UniProtKB/Swiss-Prot annotation:
The lineage of its organism: Bacteria, Bacillati, Actinomycetota, Actinomycetes, Mycobacteriales. Belongs to the haloalkane dehalogenase family. Type 1 subfamily. It is an enzyme of class 3 (hydrolase). SUPFAM superfamilies: alpha/beta-Hydrolases (SSF53474). Gene3D superfamilies: alpha/beta hydrolase. It catalyses: 1-haloalkane + H2O = a halide anion + a primary alcohol + H(+). Pfam families: Abhydrolase_1. Monomer. The active site is at D123, D250, H279. This is Haloalkane dehalogenase 1. Catalyzes hydrolytic cleavage of carbon-halogen bonds in halogenated aliphatic compounds, leading to the formation of the corresponding primary alcohols, halide ions and protons. Keywords: Hydrolase. The gene is dhmA1. It comes from Mycobacterium tuberculosis (strain ATCC 25618 / H37Rv). Was identified as a high-confidence drug target.
Amino acid sequence: MDVLRTPDSRFEHLVGYPFAPHYVDVTAGDTQPLRMHYVDEGPGDGPPIVLLHGEPTWSYLYRTMIPPLSAAGHRVLAPDLIGFGRSDKPTRIEDYTYLRHVEWVTSWFENLDLHDVTLFVQDWGSLIGLRIAAEHGDRIARLVVANGFLPAAQGRTPLPFYVWRAFARYSPVLPAGRLVNFGTVHRVPAGVRAGYDAPFPDKTYQAGARAFPRLVPTSPDDPAVPANRAAWEALGRWDKPFLAIFGYRDPILGQADGPLIKHIPGAAGQPHARIKASHFIQEDSGTELAERMLSWQQAT
């Protein structure tokens, strides 16, 4: 497996991202160890919050949520998935599988020995994080899903998703910053768009971002479907606190909270919300998300 590592110079002077880098080696199956980057802010002995990003972003997406969460006494950790941010980037699309992503993040949890975690997930962070919650529930104390879901090839896949999948596969460029701008209610300033572009000096660094859309299980014969269906069954027994905060302006996932709230026992009686935000809800409403999380945690 050939691997690229984005030069550190690409991450200098980013708008609103003053966090020191941290690294740990992770593994998946028989793959070589890869270096995963993560933010680690707040007191080391504080109650841990883990923030998982998705496509095509990185921990930069959480830059407005990390300060208020850590200031409230939490240890806030935000990893960059393999292929994204400051983490290592295998160069072939075929190097990335759904299972490997789950195993890489699981390895990160294990190496940091994280327990009693409040796990916040969005986009592909939910596809990975909900699997981890179902398979390693002893590590997770609370779940928050924002504009996410757990696909198991049941029901119809929205047409806009297939448009996005085709774009990611065939477009000669994959402009992360512009894509984030397209998926928000508010215009994203140029300096912030540059922050999303920083991990990808050129297209050779983008195999992970190209791979993600095609890894979403949309047919029953997808290799990820059995594990996802087992995870969905396990979530049907999840009685720990579960919160859904969705941006209703998201054209693909804006109403995907309903099945989660109905299925997960721990969702009963929680202050779920749909707010004026689009797919990248952290970019639209990061401060509000942090405030809602903190008040909810105090109550649970």
